């Protein structure tokens, strides 16, 4: 068996290799805890699902591109690389066209957990995003993170780079994704509590859909937000607008609150469905594996309908 021991780069090699190598070592030195959790979740789900490589693709559908630092060494086509001084990676055409973009909301309203036993919403959103990204990169697909300015990429380095960016959200991070200019085959996963005003959500959705993307919305719900278990005197603080409401008997508004909450959630779902997008709801007191399987299945089903 050939040795896999690490060999340092020869100092005579071009300096252009130094920066990618240093970044790879930095990303691999310490994994964010949420990525560790996501990888544990992914491992369980991966065993229960089949790869989504399109059937019937033969050798004539392969194409080659230059090797990038984030690519796995197993993806190198050595026969093609032997014809040149560069390394080449072999891809199927449909795989090369697939890129999945992510937008994880980590705004003020997402930094909430009603119980110690459940994670804050932004943490669950991060774990689900990373777990799905891990599944996709295992299938050879590219992933990208909106708002970073970085191009999409594939492989373990891409996943770790994404994890480091998601693990440390900005204090005043936007709750809506930026405009997206992409190829029509690309997809977008938007994970949020979707508590923004409905007109803002609808406007953002239309802009993304008109850019050519197909998308998947995942609403992250804290159990208290849906059940409203409060009784007696209760104080409610809205972190996003720094507003406070005090109720003498909170239980008296429960029925009306739940109607409004459900109506808001249903409206977001209708916006998505009218555009041909998928909408899933997930509570933080439920298993993240269930949500991951549903989301992964929704992507596979939508691609099958679109002929990808």
Task: Mark where each language-model region is.
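Exposed, interaction-prone extracellular/peripheral surfaces
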Residues: 2-56, 65-74, 80-85, 89-308
């Amino acid at each position: 068996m050939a040795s896999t021991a690490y060999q340092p780069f020869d100092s005579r090699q071009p300096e252009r290799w130094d920066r990618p190598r240093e970044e790879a070592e930095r990303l691999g030195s310490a994994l964010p805890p949420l990525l560790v959790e996501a990888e544990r979740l992914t491992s369980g789900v991966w065993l229960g699902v089949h790869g989504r490589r399109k059937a019937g693709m033969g050798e004539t559908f392969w194409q080659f591109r230059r090797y990038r630092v984030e690519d796995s060494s197993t993806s190198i086509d050595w026969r093609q690389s032997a014809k040149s001084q560069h390394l080449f990676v072999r891809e199927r055409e449909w795989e090369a066209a697939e890129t999945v973009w992510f937008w994880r909301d980590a705004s003020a309203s997402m930094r909430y957990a009603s119980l110690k036993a459940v994670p804050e919403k932004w943490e669950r959103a991060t774990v689900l995003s990373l777990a799905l990204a891990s599944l996709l990169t295992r299938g050879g697909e590219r992933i990208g993170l909106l708002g970073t300015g970085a191009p999409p990429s594939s492989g373990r380095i891409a996943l770790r780079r994404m994890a480091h960016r998601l693990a440390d959200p900005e204090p005043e991070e936007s709750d809506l994704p930026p405009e997206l200019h992409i190829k029509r085959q690309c997809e977008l996963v938007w994970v949020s509590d979707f508590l923004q005003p409905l007109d803002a959500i609808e406007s953002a959705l239309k802009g993304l859909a008109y850019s050519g993307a197909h998308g998947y919305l995942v609403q992250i719900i804290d159990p208290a937000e849906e059940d409203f278990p409060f009784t007696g005197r209760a104080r409610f603080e809205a972190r996003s607008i720094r507003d406070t409401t005090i109720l003498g008997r909170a239980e008296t508004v429960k029925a009306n609150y739940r109607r409004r909450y459900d109506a808001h959630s249903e409206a977001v779902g209708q916006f998505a469905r009218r555009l041909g997008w998928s909408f899933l709801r997930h509570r933080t007191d439920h298993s993240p594996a269930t949500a991951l399987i549903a989301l992964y299945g929704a992507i596979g089903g939508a691609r099958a309908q679109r002929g990808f």
